[in-house]
Structure formats: structure tokens, C-alpha cells
Amino acid sequence: MNQSYILPNAWSLIEEGFDPSRVKSSESLFSIGNGAMGQRANFEEYYSGPTFQGSYMGGVYYPDKTRVGWWKNGYPEYFAKVLNAPSWIGIYIKVNGQDLDLYTAKEVHSFRRELQMQTGLLLRSFEVTLANGTRLSIESSRFLSLAQDTIGAIEYKVTLLEGAADIEVKSFLDSGVKNEDSNWDDAFWQTTAVNAKENTAFIEAQTNKTNFKTVTYQATEVYLNTAKRVLPTQTMEGELAVGHLYKASLKSGDTLTTYKYGGYILDRKVTGTLEAAVFEVVGRATSAGFEALKTAHANAWKAIWDRADIVIEGDVKAQQGIRFNIFQLNQTYTGKDATLNIGPKGFTGEKYGGSTYWDTEAYCIPFYMATKDQKVARNLLQYRYNQLDKAIENAAKLGFSNGAALYPMVTMNGEECHNEWEITFEEIHRNGAIAFAIFN
């Protein structure tokens, strides 16, 4: 790895010590995904310092109208933006009236963040002294299930290190999100419904222009010292957010553990209503519980590594780097869905846009051919075949006829959507890359 603060380790990315100047970088490096959804490694708790919030759904995009000083023949009408989706990870902690916020805390000790590539787990732990003097120990574990790709899970533990304290836990969803990367500062999302029932909450939203109908959901369980269930004292509903508030009194050594299950469901993937789909998924998640879901997820990663691992002896940084590449490829694209492809930044952020570049055929397909069942590479080629008519339309815009096809430089649905005209039409090798992949 070329980030000097990342500790060399054969199977993990490890960061030790809290430095606010590294937060955004680490949010990218420690990102997680399961092909259907992904997220930057944002903190679950409130953070008032510089951060780049990002959660994403595979294949969901917005056609952001092109912004140029002059128009040229064949110039794409829009750039397909990867959408920052409603966030489901929020677990805000308040102790004796003081927010848990690493940016304003009096002291932060023993901060450690680890991305376990072998098991697909994102772990974080630290001790903190809040501005009001309260001392806490925090441990969090998070993953997006490879075994059930509509389910993500968080285990978040707060231990009081001394004294006594009243604690509040706010578990919530937030659809008041925006893309930092926007040509015209358009609203990409429209929230259509906000609801909460018992320990479950959900927000229905759809994208403007492309009309992807989605639901973001959560189910929360809170326990005091693993045994006593803490029930929500209040349901919080707003136009763009919904959640539950939990309260407890702690003495020194007590631990409050929050289990949170969340994720996204697209209407095109279900036959009934989105609300019915939420309660079906929540039922599966809560019935299984965090540990069983984690085990199934780790087993799915084990099956991947059994076929895809590359061992480099004598250079731990090189070993770490190649496994990071393998990890990112597999959490970006699993091969289950022929409507998805391999975005250039995976689920690390919204910049660069687009879902599909020629890199898929030139560089990625050989990897999947060597490490996956053949249907995975076949699905990537099926994706291009399904967009052949759009490639013919694209060629026609440039004066070609008789069935000539020019595949786009960048696309989400088969239409060209790269905003740089010169790059779009100089990089004509993309047809050759696709032909090369078919040959292979």
C-alpha cells in the first residue's frame, strides 16, 4: 500500500491513531461493498469534522445534464452520476447531554481501524474522553453481507469506563443527502415516504429523471450488558429522516450494545410492495442475528479467497496490495446480476461517474475468468450485448450507418455519458477491448 500510515499486514488494512486530516482518505480506503450496495467507511456516530459521506446502490444513477461552453457533434447530453444514497448507518450517541464526536472530544486514545479482507469486516475501536469529562470505550463491527446482498449489519458497543452516566442512542435513517459532484446542483433524489413501526424504520425515495424507486431500511436492537433489552422511548420522524431513540443509565463497566440491520431494496427486484419487502428482509436479518449473518458473510468471502488468492512471499506490502485489489474487485462486482458492471471507483466514492468503462473488458474480465465460474464473465458480456442497440445509435450520431456500432466510453444504460468530448472520441479502442473479451 502506498499510504504510509496504513500498517503493513498480509490480510488487513490497519490504521492506528486518530488524525482528522486522514479521515477522508481512510473513508475511501476502508470502504465496503457486496456488489449490490456499498459505502465509504464513515463513522456511525456523529462527526463534526471534515468528512465525505457516501452510500451507494449498484446501478442506480442520475443523468446530470452536460455543462460546456460550446456544443460539438456527438457531445453526450449528460454525465451519469453515481448517486449518494440515503444513509442507514447512523448511530448517534449522547452521554450526560454531550455528543460523542471524535472531532471535538477532549482526548482520543487507542484509535484503531481495521478492514479484514479475509472476512470482509470493518472494525473500529477507541477510548475517548468527551468534552464534559465522560470516559468511554467504543467498539464497532460492520459488514455488507455477501450471502444476502440486501442486508448490512452493525454491532456498536459503548462501555462506560468510570462513574455513572445517562446515555441516549439515536438510530436513524437520513435521506437528506447530496452529491458533492454535481454539474448544476440539481436534486437527484425525491423522498416519497417516511415510516416507522416498532423497532423498524424505512424511507422510500426515487431518483429524479431515471425514476429508480428504492427503500432504505433499518431495524435496531439495543441491549444493556448483553442481557437486558432496551426498548425505544421515542420515534423520531421528519421529512427526510426517521429513527428511534433509546435511553439507559450506566454505571462504571456497563456496556450498551446496539445491533443495527439496514440496507436498500429496489422495486425492480421485488414483486410486491417495498414496505412488504422491508419487513420480509428485516424478519430474516433479526431472526438470524448478527453473529449468524457475520459467519455466513465470512464463509462467502472464504469461498472467494479459496479460488482467487495470490500469495507473494517475502514482501508483505506487495501481498497486502494484491489482496486489496482482489478484495475491491470482488466487493464491487459479484457476477450475480447481468444489469450491473464494474464502476471505476467501486463503492469508494462518487467521483469519476459512470458504471461501465472499457477497463472491464480489457483488464477485469480476464481476472474473473481465472477466478470465477464462467457465468460471471458471461454476464459482463451479456451486459454489452443488451446495449448493442444503443451502440448502433451512438455510431449513427457520428454519421455511421448500416448497423455500425460504437460502444460508449462511459455508460450506465448504453448511452454515451462522458463529459469530455475529446476523450470520448479519441479513445476508440473500447470496441477493440470488447472484441478482445469476446475472443477470450
Regions found by a protein language model. Give the residues of each.
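Substrate-binding groove/exosite segments of carbohydrate-active enzymes
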Residues: Q39, L293-N440
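Beta-sandwich/jelly-roll carbohydrate-recognition scaffolds of carbohydrate-active enzymes
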Residues: N2-R323
